[in-house]
Amino acid sequence: MAQKRGTRLGCNDCNEINYITRKNAKKNPEKLSLNKYCSRCRGTTVHKEVKRK
């Protein structure tokens, strides 16, 4: 079987994709939103789930 693709988290301020994580889409259908460190902004910002192209 094919592996699951990771969920990408992008910074809300600068739109840079900094993190890749996994989530259970059946249990958590809404978009993931976490406070994470952004190296471009040099601080903690909200990172939201970004749609794959």
Swiss-Prot record:
This is Large ribosomal subunit protein bL33A. Pfam families: Ribosomal_L33. One of its GO terms (cellular component) is ribonucleoprotein complex. The gene is rpmG1. One of its GO terms (molecular function) is structural constituent of ribosome. It comes from the Bacteria. Keywords: Ribonucleoprotein, Ribosomal protein. One of its GO terms (biological process) is translation. Belongs to the bacterial ribosomal protein bL33 family. InterPro entries: Ribosomal_bL33 (IPR001705), Ribosomal_bL33_CS (IPR018264), Ribosomal_bL33_sf (IPR038584), Ribosomal_zn-bd (IPR011332).
